[in-house]
Amino acid sequence: ATTAQLQWVVDAYSVVFAGALLLAGSLGDRFGRRRALVIGLVVFGLGSLAAGFATTADMLILCRAVMGIGGAFIMPSTLSILVQVFTDRQARAQAIGIWAAVAGAAIAIGPIVGGLLIEHTTWHAIFWVNPPLVVIAIIATFALVPESRDPSKPRLDVMGAVLSSVGIIAFV
C-alpha cells in the first residue's frame, strides 16, 4: 500500500463520520433514536467485519468509510437516548459524564489493544473485535432502550444536510 492509502485507511473513518454526523442525528430525531442506533451498529459492525477480510488497501479504505457512517449514527443517537431516558437532571449529568468517560477511555485504550493484537496476531484482528461487541450492543439495545423521537417531527432539511456535510468534509 502507498503512504497515501495508509493515511486514507485512518482518515476515511473520520472524514465520513464528520460529514454524516449532523444528518444521522437529524434522522434519529425524526425516525427514532433506537432505530438509528441499531442501524448505526449494524452498519459499523458489517463495515468492521468486511474490513477484517479486506484484501486490498482500497477495500480497507471503503470499509473504514462504511464504519464512519455507522459511527455517525451511533454517537448522536446514544447521547440523545441518554437525554430522553434520564429525566432527572443529576442522573442525566452523571449518565452523560459516564458516556463521555467511556468514549474517552475507548479512544485511549483502542490503539493500545490494536497494537497488541497486531503484534501477536494479524492486523485483521483489530476489526474482528468489533462484530461480537456489536451483536451484544444490538441485543442490549432491543432489551433496554426505549424508542424515542422528536415529537414535533421536524422537517428534514435535505439541502442544509448536504451543504453542511460537504462543508464539514471540506473542513476536515
Model-assigned labels for residue ranges:
Residues A1-A20, A57-L62, A95:
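Extracellular/periplasmic helix-loop-helix junction of adjacent transmembrane segments
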Residues R33-I39:
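Juxtamembrane helix-start motifs in multi-pass secondary transporters
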Residues A65-A101:
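Cytoplasmic helix-loop-helix junction between adjacent transmembrane helices
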Residues G97, E119-V172:
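Hydrophobic transmembrane-helix bundles of small-molecule transporters
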Residues G32, F53-M59, T121-T122:
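Helix-breaking motifs and short loop linkers at transmembrane-helix boundaries and internal kinks
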Residues G25-S26, R30, L116:
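Membrane-interface helix termini in secondary transporters
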Residues V42-T55:
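C-terminal ends and interior cores of transmembrane alpha-helices
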